[in-house]
């Protein structure tokens, strides 16, 4: 199984060095009726009109209804083939037929629902390995809402909204490890989740916190990501934290965090995951980056 690996930098920071396929991480409630900007980009990355999309409905309790919605959307956008696949047991996730579904797809998409269902049913199975292998050979992996949260190595399971950073306001669990070194939260601005994301990053200061608004996506390619959609992405960086009272306060007591960084990045901006720096014009940066690669 191919897993992303850590690269240690000067100053003790750690960066992401992931598999080669792009990750399309959506904050939920993506546009499905209008321009469908995010889903259209996912499909483009997955092969456009030659795309064979596998929609994973494992997170939802309504796999037929949710799955058919995405089948209709991706077919409307021009996909060559769209299949849904629901996993109801770990035994099913280890079958040869399940692995073949993954191998045959040119791109894989996880719907929303409950992120714990994804890790409980897929973590450590042959499907888990097959999806990581698909990423390694460059196939895109997308996920929305719960399908976004599960992508990190440490994921937010649930927690309080509209709260200041405190001990006990967020519950964490191991994720699927498609993106190391990050903690992801979704429906971010709409549900007032800054407090719980900061609380999570305070407990894991070596991780970046990525808070993704609705109808907004982070598209990770290598060590960089770009932002696409109507909202913004909030990046919480505790790497330069100078003081925390985490070890001296109890449950529900307020956290003191000094030196923490917050970046707010709308459509057209990006982020360097290695340097932990914002990219203020993605298209300009990408053009210059490509020129450097061809020298």
Question: Where are the regions a protein language model picked out?
Answer:
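C-terminal and late-domain segments of enzyme folds
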Residues: 2-49, 61-76, 156-157, 161-295
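General beta-strand structural signal in soluble alpha/beta enzymes
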Residues: 25, 83-85, 109-110, 141-144, ...
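Portal/gating segments that form or line small-molecule/metal binding sites
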Residues: 54, 60-104, 110, 117
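Catalytic-core regions built around general acid/base machinery
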Residues: 100-101, 124-138
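Catalytic nucleophile loop
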Residues: 110-112, 131, 135-155
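Glycine/threonine-rich flexible loop motifs
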Residues: 115-125
């Amino acid at each position: 199984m191919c897993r992303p690996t850590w690269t240690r930098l000067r100053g003790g920071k750690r960066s992401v060095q992931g598999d080669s396929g792009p990750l399309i991480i959506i904050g939920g409630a993506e546009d499905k009726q209008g321009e469908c900007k995010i889903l259209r980009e996912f499909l483009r990355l997955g092969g456009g009109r030659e795309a064979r999309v596998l929609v994973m409905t494992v997170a939802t309790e309504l796999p037929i209804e949710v799955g058919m919605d995405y089948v209709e959307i991706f077919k409307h956008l021009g996909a060559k083939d769209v299949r849904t696949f629901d996993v109801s047991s770990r035994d099913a996730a280890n079958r040869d037929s399940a692995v073949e579904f993954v191998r045959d797809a040119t791109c894989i998409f996880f719907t929303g629902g409950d992120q714990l269902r994804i890790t409980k049913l897929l973590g450590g199975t042959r499907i888990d390995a097959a999806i990581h292998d698909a990423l390694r050979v460059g196939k895109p992996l997308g996920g929305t809402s719960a399908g976004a949260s599960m992508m990190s190595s440490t994921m937010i399971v649930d927690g309080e909204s509209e709260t200041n950073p405190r001990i006990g306001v967020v519950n964490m669990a191991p994720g699927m490890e498609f993106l190391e070194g990050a903690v992801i939260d979704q429906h971010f601005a709409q549900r007032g989740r800054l407090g719980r994301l900061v609380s999570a990053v305070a407990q894991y200061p070596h991780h970046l916190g990525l808070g993704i608004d609705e109808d907004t996506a982070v598209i990770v390619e290598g060590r960089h990501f770009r932002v696409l959609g109507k909202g913004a992405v909030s990046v919480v960086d505790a790497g330069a934290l100078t003081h925390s009272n985490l070890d001296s306060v109890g449950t529900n007591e307020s956290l003191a965090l000094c030196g923490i960084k917050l970046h707010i990045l709308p459509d057209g901006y990006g982020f360097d995951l290695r340097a932990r720096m914002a990219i203020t014009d993605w298209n300009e940066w990408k053009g210059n980056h490509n020129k450097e690669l061809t020298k």
